Amino acid sequence: MVTVNPSQAHCLPMKMSLPGFNTLPHTATTIPVSIRSNRTMSFFEDPTKKVRKPYTITKSRENWTEQEHDKFLEALHLFDRDWKKIKAFVGSKTVIQIRSHAQKYFLKVQKNGTKEHLPPPRPKRKANHPYPQKAPKFTLSSSNALFQHDYLYNTNSHPVISTTRKHGLVHCDVSIPSSVIKEEFGVSENCCSTSSSRDKQRTRIVTETNDQESCGKPHRVAPNFAEVYNFIGSVFDPKTTGHVKRLKEMDPINLETVLLLMKNLSVNLTSPEFDEQRKLISSYNAS
């Protein structure tokens, strides 16, 4: 007969560890709240979205001096809105800085209501090759359907056609040079063409760039006063020679300025107000 020993346990207790398992002491790990929130946010974010870099000012803004602003105003009178030429005239600012300064200046003038010179806005450029449109099927009638022409006058004062077509006929009573008509229309001066032939022989739209417009205008260029006064000072220096050669090598505007100043100087020296100066100069010559 088998007897059960009450001291022996039928099963292993819960706190007893098996050999080879759970040998390390149990430690509870806690995740910080910030890490858990970041993990939650990263789970819902789009993985393809790029991380935006923080905005940093790489270059500090440079204030305009009074001399630079005066040059800017003078260049605005000369070149209107040709920013590249204004940049070359000012010399110390970029095109972007000049355009930004001009925008602020225009807003300030409009707000104050002062009568300052503001250059007109640039005309919108038309396409060199506009998208072809189907010609409307109109019957030939002389009472309606005429072209409305606009003319762009260039420097040689010849009109050039450069506008849109509204109806089906071309009115040829306007005095246009025959060379322009033959080149653009391919017909004689007193002939009219329908819209279909007009589409086959489309006129080239004249678009003058800003450089061409500026070339047509007479620009005032300031003389180089350093060179002018240097030459006038060398005239009274007995050690300096070759004045005629230097005059020939000068720019026309510098040469004109030198001659004008020398003429004014000679007129002033002949006036009675400079008698003492003339006597002083003659005493040096006598000695």
Curated annotation (Swiss-Prot):
Disordered: annotated span: 111-135
Keyword entries, A-Z: DNA-binding, Nucleus, Transcription, Transcription regulation
Residue range(s) of DNA binding per entry: 83-106
Locations listed in the record: Nucleus
Pfam families in the cross-refs: Myb_DNA-binding, RVE6
Transmembrane segments: none
Function statement: Probable transcription factor.
Name recorded for this polypeptide: Protein REVEILLE 3
Lineage: Eukaryota, Viridiplantae, Streptophyta, Embryophyta, Tracheophyta
